[in-house]
């Protein structure tokens, strides 16, 4: 078991977890015998141990009659480590989380249990996994922390509100009888907050228009006699506010209250989720604190998956169903397998490290759901969207483009709920995506797969774990398990074929494109040379030589470019600067963006104002935007990054270097546009960009990646390096030919596992020099009925394409690295399509395990019936005709 260095399924399918010095596994009856110290495999992961600070909180919780859940305690341990790493932990006097499992837990001062614990006065209301409220100024929680415990010129105090109520309210504070002290009103009017910082009441009134929504972290900070600044959700929004009076406090020395303040009849009608009292924290520390403790609070509120970090915990892991990669398909497959009674484990790939990596690309910003027919999105993913719409977004649940789009924050909430077995219908009041026992192990990636005949018996991870399973699922975005299992695979584009596949292979010459001013707009001739007209001067950044591949020939390096799907908002209350502190990011050089300067100059010369839609595709979900490559063709897709990723091959460090280049490209582009002062940049474009901000409620944990806060950590990989290459069946663009395979006709296979509903959409492979002009090579987009599934825009996708040939491997499934042509994959690659196939994959795995047969030998009608009866609110359709 885990206490001996390994993880195996425990009673009732619940993980027995390696909780060194910590709490009991969730759902497992505690045993009176002590937990032995695990013995890690030599060279493998080290034993996990809670920090002493976390142990103190856990001991205090147990003493209060409310032991902490192990999975949630691990998330607290992680938040404390982040706080210590920033230097904020040592400066804090008190840290409270009101969204706890019990009132006894929420009263504990996490920073120093036993000192400044909350005392309940009157009858404030505590709601488990939510927050605290009050109906009267006589009902509150007293911290016991005196005002003078923080220095007049050395303090940071913040409160975390979940409500948008405005009024003459006090969320938290300490005042003497003269009204002097520290207090926070997170929202006084629609545009203002009222705070004081050892000053007379209302002496600070940061009236940034429409900034103060009442929700998020807010509070005053002071580190000198006259300079006070105010922070909202980790971002300084009112810097260096001059105080008209620097007041002193008399002998009363009142204590800080939460849900009110001494000496005032004002109270608050807002719901509060947390607070802290500290010596002065720097702006960087505040941002990190807001991110770390918001992330922890979200786990307390919506769900805390059991997560083992890279190199810590179980040396051996055993489960019936093992999903590799933290993608949405892996989550859905593991979730449904657990729902079907199998023991499961998700094993992180090389790019997976933090909780924000779980769920894959939607967690990393891809939240505007692409589907020609939104109603084709069904099953678990549709239930996730329904839950997000009704519970998290509180909006109408509709099968429309907008109704099926989401925000990374809402999506993360759904993921956390799904992977926490304590999130039952009874506990939450919702029957949607009820939590299952799905542990996650971050590993640094795979290094080997052990085979017995055609069966994978175990896999080995980069951090030295051995994972044994009965059926394996490759949900990674690279297809590494496909490769390591010896399954034939395809890298890059195959040569052109017949019919719709004539658009495959290397597309040059007549198929090359130019930069353009807008979709269908003016095509621009852009010189590719450092000195225009002089090839001897070399090419500008991002332009490569023509590779000399014959038109239609195979293109082994033909991988679509990588991107980062940024999460922006134009709501002022959700503001984090696009280029923080106006400082150039690592690797920045203005010369990298010369191609944009020339595009803008050519547009101006053509009397065209280059619109922001040409630069960036900005799609909205409730005021939060998914930012993608724009209509002008050269945009946030990192130039030629697919070529670099193909060249990186099996090297994880080389892949990470490409990720870093993508981050540098996009963050540098934002800096160049906003701050370089290049005269060629249209003023209107700068003005448009100034209306957007990074959303500080998303992308809260960059881990060790070096990515700044509020930027997505992982790059968007549009296609795997390694696609399954079956001899028996390969889905291709002709399967989507609505002319030769019209609606209602029979597909090549009727063993449907998902439906495809999108255009052939392949982004450019190369930005290159062709005849002294910049050419955009490799792009394909065709949304006609011929190429996108006929009039109904729906194409069935079969079982034979998600399992390898039986001669290669008999216990492996993938709904990501499927057996498909690269061209057809341009339509298949949408997250809902892969997610629905993953749900059926779980039914396939269950059938194969129960009958001890190969995944290729399952009885499809039985699998189909099981998938349709899965209990989803909107069941899968699995149409068997075109």
Regions found by a protein language model. Give the residues of each.
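Extracytoplasmic low-complexity segments
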Residues: 1, 6-17, 24-30, 34-154, ...
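Acidic glycine-/aspartate-rich tracts in secreted/extracellular proteins
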Residues: 99-104, 224-226, 278-285
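Extracellular glycan-interaction surfaces
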Residues: 115-139, 143-149, 158-168, 173-244
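Extracellular glycan-interaction patches encoded by glycine-rich segments
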Residues: 247-283
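Conserved N-terminal/central alpha/beta ligand/cofactor-binding core
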Residues: 310-311, 342-343, 347-445, 490, ...
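Beta1/beta-strand and adjacent pyrophosphate-binding region of the FAD-binding site
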Residues: 315-329
């Amino acid at each position: 078991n885990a206490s001996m260095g390994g993880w195996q399924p425990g009673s009732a399918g619940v993980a027995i977890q390696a909780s060194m010095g910590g709490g009991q596994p969730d759902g497992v009856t505690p045993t009176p015998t002590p937990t032995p110290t695990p013995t890690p495999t030599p060279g493998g992961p080290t034993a996990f141990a809670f920090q002493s600070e976390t142990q103190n909180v856990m001991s205090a919780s147990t003493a209060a009659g409310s032991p902490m859940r192990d999975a949630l305690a691990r998330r607290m341990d992680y938040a404390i480590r982040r706080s210590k790493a920033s230097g904020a932990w040592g400066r804090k006097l008190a840290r409270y989380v009101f969204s706890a499992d019990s009132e006894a837990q929420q009263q504990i001062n996490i920073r120093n249990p036993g000192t400044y614990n909350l005392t309940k006065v009157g009858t404030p209301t505590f709601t488990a996994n939510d927050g605290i409220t009050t109906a009267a100024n006589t009902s509150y929680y007293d911290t016991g922390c005196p005002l003078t415990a923080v220095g007049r010129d050395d303090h940071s105090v913040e409160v975390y509100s979940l409500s948008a109520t405005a009024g003459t309210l006090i969320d938290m504070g300490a005042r003497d009888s003269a009204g002097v002290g520290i207090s926070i009103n997170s929202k006084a009017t629609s545009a203002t907050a009222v705070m004081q910082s050892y000053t007379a009441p209302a002496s600070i009134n940061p009236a940034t228009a429409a900034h103060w929504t009442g929700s998020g972290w807010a509070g005053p900070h002071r580190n000198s006699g006259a300079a006070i600044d105010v922070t909202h959700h980790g971002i300084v929004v009112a810097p260096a506010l001059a105080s008209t009076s620097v007041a002193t406090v008399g002998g009363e020395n009142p204590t800080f209250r939460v849900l009110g303040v001494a000496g005032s009849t004002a109270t608050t009608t807002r719901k509060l989720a947390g607070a802290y009292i500290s010596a002065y924290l720097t702006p960087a520390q505040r941002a990190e604190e807001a991110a770390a403790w918001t992330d922890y609070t979200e786990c307390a509120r919506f769900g805390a998956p059991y997560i083992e970090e890279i190199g810590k915990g179980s040396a051996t892991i055993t489960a019936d169903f093992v999903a590799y990669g933290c993608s949405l398909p892996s989550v859905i497959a593991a979730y449904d397998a657990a729902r079907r009674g199998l023991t499961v484990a998700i094993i992180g790939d090389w790019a997976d490290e933090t909780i924000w990596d779980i769920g894959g690309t939607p967690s990393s910003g891809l939240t505007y759901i692409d589907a020609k027919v939104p109603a084709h999105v069904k099953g678990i993913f549709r239930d996730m969207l329904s839950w997000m719409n009704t519970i998290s977004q509180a909006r109408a649940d509709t099968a429309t483009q907008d109704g099926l789009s989401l925000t990374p924050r809402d999506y993360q909430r759904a993921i956390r709920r799904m992977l926490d077995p304590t999130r039952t219908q009874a506990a939450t009041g919702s029957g949607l995506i009820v939590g299952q026992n799905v542990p996650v192990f971050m590993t640094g990636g795979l290094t080997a797969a052990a085979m017995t005949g055609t069966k994978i018996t175990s896999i080995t991870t980069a951090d030295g774990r051995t994972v044994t399973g009965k059926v394996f699922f490759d949900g990674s975005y690279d297809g590494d398990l496909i490769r390591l299992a010896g399954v034939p695979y395809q890298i890059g584009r195959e040569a052109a074929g017949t019919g719709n596949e004539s658009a495959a292979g290397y597309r040059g010459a007549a198929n090359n494109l130019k930069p353009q001013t807008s979709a269908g707009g003016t095509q621009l001739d852009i010189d590719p040379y450092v000195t225009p007209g002089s090839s001897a001067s070399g090419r500008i950044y991002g332009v490569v030589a023509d590779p000399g591949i014959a038109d239609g020939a195979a293109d082994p390096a033909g991988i679509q470019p990588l991107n980062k799907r940024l999460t922006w908002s134009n709501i002022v209350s959700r503001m984090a600067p696009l280029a923080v502190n106006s400082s150039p990011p690592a690797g920045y050089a203005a010369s990298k963006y010369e191609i944009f300067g020339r595009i803008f100059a050519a547009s101006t010369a053509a009397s065209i104002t280059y619109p922001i839609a040409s630069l960036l595709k900005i799609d909205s979900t409730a005021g939060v935007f998914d930012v993608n490559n724009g209509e002008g063709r050269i945009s946030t897709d990192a130039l030629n990054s697919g070529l670099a990723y193909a060249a990186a091959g099996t090297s994880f460090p080389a892949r990470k270097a490409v990720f870093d280049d993508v981050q540098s490209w996009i963050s540098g582009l934002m800096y160049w546009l906003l701050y370089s002062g290049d005269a060629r940049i249209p003023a209107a474009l700068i003005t448009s960009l100034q209306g957007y901000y990074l959303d500080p409620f998303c992308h809260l944990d960059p881990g060790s990646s070096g990515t700044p806060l509020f930027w997505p950590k992982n790059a968007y990989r549009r296609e795997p390096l390694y696609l399954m290459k079956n001899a028996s069946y390969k889905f291709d663009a002709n399967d989507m030919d609505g002319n030769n395979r019209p609606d209602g006709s029979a597909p090549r296979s009727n063993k449907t596992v998902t439906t495809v509903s999108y255009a052939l959409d392949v982004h450019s492979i190369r930005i290159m020099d062709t005849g002294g002009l910049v050419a955009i090579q490799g792009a394909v987009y065709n949304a006609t009925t011929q190429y996108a599934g006929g009039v109904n825009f729906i194409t069935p996708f079969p079982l034979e394409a998600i399992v390898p040939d039986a001669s290669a491997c008999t216990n492996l499934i993938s709904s990501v690295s499927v057996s498909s042509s690269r061209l057809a994959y341009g339509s298949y690659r949408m997250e809902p399509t892969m997610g629905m196939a993953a749900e059926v994959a779980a039914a396939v795995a269950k059938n194969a395990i129960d009958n001890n047969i190969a995944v290729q030998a399952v009885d499809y009608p039985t699998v189909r019936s099981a998938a349709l009866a899965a209990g989803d609110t909107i069941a899968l359709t699995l149409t068997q005709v075109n």
